[in-house]
Amino acid sequence: MTQFVKPYNDDPFVGNLATPITTSSFTRTLLSNLPAYRAGLSPLLRGLEIGMTHGYFLVGPFYKLGPLRNSEVALLAGVFSALGLIIIMAACLAIYGVVSFNTNDGGEQLQSAKGWRQFTSGWLVGSIGGASFAYILIANVSFLQTGSSLLK
């Protein structure tokens, strides 16, 4: 048992954060396929994809847990609440880009002012699109359920 658990590089004062979970090929593949880490994506497409998921998942909590959840306008209020939060978050992303990146930096990388502006623009468009898509799905859920029963 003493050979199994031993200090990293035989030095008890050096730590290592590698675990069987973090070093597995499954975890590495899963993380490398996320849009934040995927190689070859432009900042605009990266922001668009990340924004779509955020917009899509923001509608549900506002719709089901918002103060108007038991009224007829719950879905509309949930969508407008999600859109309001999306605009606030896009403003925060823009402010972060202004204070974090030098305007002299060039290139299409995400760590430049131009790249961050593209990311923010893509995120805003994607999140509004994701919230709109969630609204369309929830508003037509009864139609979708009757359509699926016809296929059986």
UniProtKB/Swiss-Prot annotation:
Family according to the record: Belongs to the PsaL family.
Question: What UniProt keywords are attached to this protein's entry?
Answer: Chloroplast, Membrane, Photosynthesis, Photosystem I, Plastid, Thylakoid, Transmembrane, Transmembrane helix
* Membrane topology note: Multi-pass membrane protein
* The organism's taxonomic lineage, starting at the top: Eukaryota, Cryptophyceae, Pyrenomonadales, Geminigeraceae, Guillardia
Q: Which Pfam families match?
A: PsaL
Q: Which domain of life is it from?
A: Eukaryota
State the organism of origin: Guillardia theta (Cryptophyte)
Give the gene that encodes this protein: psaL
Where in or outside the cell? Plastid, Chloroplast thylakoid membrane
Its recorded name reads Photosystem I reaction center subunit XI
Q: Which residues lie on this side of the membrane: Stromal?
A: 1-72, 145-152
